[in-house]
Amino acid sequence: MSAEQQPQQQQKLRWGIAWIYSSSNNTIITITDLTGAETVARVSGGQVVRADKDKPSPWAAMQAAYKAAQLAMARGINAVHIKVRGPGGYGMKVPGPGASAAIRALARSGLVIGRIEDVTPIPHDIIRPPSGRKGRRV
């Protein structure tokens, strides 16, 4: 096969968006179409592990990303832009421990990676944290 014929046989990329929400409690991976209106795959770390303490782990995020990638490729999406989100607000401003593992797993699963963007909501003023527990403290 000559070098001129090879790009013509390459398959056409069908893009989607992989939304990775990673907190200190769980990692949720949602793959949508480019408009974001139709959800193609949605997998969380709690779906792939048995113990609750393992939900935020990088291993659970990696398994969830592999599962979401397989579901997306079965629906015809073969390239994704990644949007990573942390809790934001008065919570952590950085994504949890599973975010980087999920990005690596999406890249290894055979999906073409476009842009990687951080979409954590960042306050532009002061956010008052929730008040403590009411009642008598001894």
Swiss-Prot record:
Q: Which gene encodes it?
A: rps11
Similarity field? Belongs to the universal ribosomal protein uS11 family.
Q: What does this protein do?
A: Located on the platform of the 30S subunit.
Natural source organism: Pyrobaculum arsenaticum (strain DSM 13514 / JCM 11321 / PZ6)
List the GO biological process terms. Answer: translation
Q: Which keywords has UniProt assigned to this entry?
A: Ribonucleoprotein, Ribosomal protein, RNA-binding, rRNA-binding
| One function term, GO molecular function aspect | structural constituent of ribosome
Protein name from the UniProt record: Small ribosomal subunit protein uS11
Pfam families membership: Ribosomal_S11
Read off the PANTHER family from this record: 40S RIBOSOMAL PROTEIN S14/30S RIBOSOMAL PROTEIN S11
Naming one, the record's GO cellular component terms include:
ribosome
Subunit and partners: Part of the 30S ribosomal subunit.
